[in-house]
Amino acid sequence: MDISNTTMERGMQRRTELLLGSDNLEKIQKARVLIFGVGGVGSWCAECLVRSGVRNITIVDSDRICITNCNRQLMATSKTVGQVKVEALKDRLLEINPNATVTCLQKIYEAETADSFEMEKYDYIVDAIDSLKDKADLILRATALPKHITFVSSMGAALRRDPFMVRKGEFWKIKGDPLARALRNKFKRAKTFPSRKFLCVYSEENPMKNMGVNKAFDTDSADYDASGEQQLVEQWSSSKAQINGSLCQITAIFGMSIAGIIVNHIVEQR
């Protein structure tokens, strides 16, 4: 069916506008969102935001899609393996709303690149990266931005299987999450702390132990994980020696919960 972009957007937002009202829909459409990491959490967050009406979104990730991404990452399919993650996700988002402005940045967030992202230009910043060092740096920088810029962070989504244990909470009050604990310990050792409170999505479920073996290291081929993706590993290091299992039923809820925090915050603003 041949539908104009304007007609498509107007039609797709009827249910959103019916629930939230035209004024709130307009606020959502004007919001500028920056997402660091578009893997199992960030990809679902991005789609949920665009479907909810967000028109201006920047997605950041350095990796290409590999086979193992297909169990949990939105844009990862048999046809997209090998493609740049942010480009594949952009294609998906523009199919949903061709009027959206989706900026792709195929680069790593780290201390050396942080200034290049111009975070002060955005209304909302989402942390969906796994590297402990880079995550800590992003938290410190994002919470030091002006208070009108809202920062939301994802804690550990791997090694869980119960979707009903996913919660939101203030970073310093999170219990039972090893990644949050590792971050807090890192801040305490460095005696450098986030400048303000911020919300996180996390799970109250005790992390499981991997019940299987990493086939990439148990066979003749390591192509499964050849993309060099930032993956949650033992102690959140950059080593590929141990990769933790994860499920879409958890990572997707993390991403959609972050999107929900953002949409609700927009609606509640006066």
Language model segments and positions:
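N-terminal charged helix/coil linker that caps or initiates catalytic domains
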Residues: 1-34
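Glycine-rich phosphate/adenylate-binding loop
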Residues: 2-6, 120-124, 129-137, 149-151, ...
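Glycine-rich phosphate-binding loop and adjoining beta1-alpha1-beta2 segment
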Residues: 54, 59-97
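Hydrophobic/small residue at the entry helix of a nucleotide-binding pocket
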Residues: 41
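Conserved SAM/SAH-binding loop
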Residues: 105-114
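Acidic/polar active-site rim loop that often engages polyanionic ligands
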Residues: 68-75, 159-170
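Conserved S-adenosyl-L-methionine
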Residues: 51-56, 147-148
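Conserved N-terminal Rossmann-fold NAD(P)-binding element of oxidoreductases
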Residues: 35-37, 60
